[in-house]
Amino acid sequence: MTDPRKFDLHDGKMGAAITVRVTPRSKRNKIAEILKDGTINIHLTSRTDEAQTNQDLIGYLAEVLQVSPKEIEIIAGTSGKDKLITILTLDSNMVQQRIMKNLS
């Protein structure tokens, strides 16, 4: 069955790239929704500064995607809520499967 919520992932030279919108100060860490433009809205319990939120995001994505945090990098948006992230060891199909499996 095809999922109607479409989001675009991109294969890079290595791995895949995703766009993420982070909502801090949430009750629990979760993938909340896929926005119309393909951005993955992630809620985090982080209540501290941006650097800690970025670390928490990488840790949460590593758990969801079943990879080491060292394989995830924030390429753009380190100081904002919208971020471009690469996952070095997974292709876009595998990232999409694991994101959809964890969508709340």
Question: Where are each of the predicted segments found?
Answer:
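Contiguous, often N-terminal, cationic amphipathic patches that form binding interfaces
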Residues: 1-59, 73-78, 83-104
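The alpha-helix within a helix-turn-helix
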Residues: 62
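Short acidic capping loops at alpha-helix termini that bridge into adjacent secondary structure
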Residues: 69-71
